[in-house]
Amino acid sequence: MTKADIVARLSDKTGLEKGDVQAIIDGFMREVRVSLETGENVFLRGFGSFILKKRAQKTGRNISLNTTLVIPAHYVPSFKPAKVFAETVKEGNPIKE
């Protein structure tokens, strides 16, 4: 499912214009991104959490130059589903292939 599919589905269910739904979804995604950029996790009860995970410093290799380089510690965004959400998905229909 793509963002366009979500916009169309929500527009049908709510009666809102697709442009309005698109603006709401874009605004939500922007707020999640800005919150994570400033180090603030986003918690949505019953759905899940957008959190930052710290990756430790490590040594990597450039195999084409046969050199080693240090990859500094950094944060990566992650989504952790709520228990209710994960259980609902687990008990749902199998994935379409």
Model-inferred region functions:
Residues M1-E97:
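Strongly charged
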